[in-house]
């Protein structure tokens, strides 16, 4: 039963709106509460491995629980754990010893896994998740004596590790399931877990399982994954149709997202637009307004289906059909020209990505603002909407820079991957049609400087800087004083 849909209207609003920045002084006890505790992570995929590495480096005792068949067959999860010198054992042997069990298995496996875990978990232990989908959308009941918490890093597992190694971290949402906090210790344990990942350096929001799920699904389906995937494919095809060398076009798109979104990470949409000439800024502003109008209905449909539970229902139906749609969409993406083009060795400077990617800048501006606006309209607090529409964006772009869409879809969850493909099915035809409106200088070449009046430029600058996502962004980025620049690919 969908837990969110079982709540009354007031309870839904209270949970959607729950979001408060945890001030740095609240982390004075670091992760001491978890020292000398047995922490067992279930599953050793991208999130499982990289969270475990961070926690161990923070002084915690971490081991892994895998299925007996996984250990016997020495599968990828077993290999991930053992190569990094973690202790691995079966559920029945290791779960009864755990004080904190962190379930990082894929969403589609969690009902079966959580049922099994509850058979072995000792009394008054803690069960952790890094995504609230199972609790909110599946609604499985958890044993009354078990405390249920969440620490949800706002990025793929690979970036959880990379940011930690830089001495920084990634923002996380933490929450305690209101049906399962018998000892009233959930918040302190979640806070310590977040600290061990390095999230205290980047920003920790005290949220709810519901707010995390609904905002996370919206962000990943639209601007974070769906829009980047859609735009990569359509912009690549457009560049090739304009006569650009296919391999150069591939590099411009693949590495362009990373270079452009790095500016967003440090200074929001304002800094991204400031990297353009004044003529290009005005043109990007105009294009982004048109893109917002064009994509508005599609973005709202995704939000509506997420809130109603329709998205989850359809995805679960696909799980029960052996991922028929998911597998078809994966195959389609793998066969695209963008994914198959060769590596280009021609040097492209950082500024050239901006100069030749004016349309890409406009797409990012439109997608960030639209997803943020619709989340806030729905009742999600601005802080949550910011992380899900803007801050996580460069972290996703980093994955595309490594191995294009293959890498992005590999490291994000199956739930994010399904939602991204679903969005692209409708978004690609829209963006292809929009390409007919492009002018020289919008994509693949630098726009010629034109005369403009100061009044127009001043108004555009004011509009960009005073959008609500920019206002909350300035506040939250003050928390991220130790944020490190990425080494561009």
From Swiss-Prot:
Alphabetical keyword list: Amino-acid biosynthesis, Branched-chain amino acid biosynthesis, Magnesium, Metal-binding, NADP, Oxidoreductase, Repeat
Group of enzyme by EC: oxidoreductase
EC number annotated for this UniProt entry: 1.1.1.86
Protein name: Ketol-acid reductoisomerase (NADP(+))
Residues engaged in binding NADP(+): 44-47, 67, 77, 107-109, 157
Chain sites annotated for binding Mg(2+) 1: 216, 220
GO MF term set: ketol-acid reductoisomerase activity; magnesium ion binding
PANTHER family from the UniProt entry: KETOL-ACID REDUCTOISOMERASE, MITOCHONDRIAL
Boundaries of every KARI C-terminal knotted domain copy: 208-343, 344-483
Pathway, per record: Amino-acid biosynthesis; L-isoleucine biosynthesis; L-isoleucine from 2-oxobutanoate: step 2/4; Amino-acid biosynthesis; L-valine biosynthesis; L-valine from pyruvate: step 2/4
Lineage: Bacteria, Pseudomonadati, Pseudomonadota, Gammaproteobacteria, Enterobacterales
Keyword Oxidoreductase in annotation: yes
A Pfam family this chain is assigned to: KARI_N
Family: Belongs to the ketol-acid reductoisomerase family.
Residues of the KARI N-terminal Rossmann domain: 16-207
GO biological process: isoleucine biosynthetic process; L-valine biosynthetic process
Function recorded in the entry: Involved in the biosynthesis of branched-chain amino acids (BCAA). Catalyzes an alkyl-migration followed by a ketol-acid reduction of (S)-2-acetolactate (S2AL) to yield (R)-2,3-dihydroxy-isovalerate. In the isomerase reaction, S2AL is rearranged via a Mg-dependent methyl migration to produce 3-hydroxy-3-methyl-2-ketobutyrate (HMKB). In the reductase reaction, this 2-ketoacid undergoes a metal-dependent reduction by NADPH to yield (R)-2,3-dihydroxy-isovalerate.
Binding site for substrate: 413
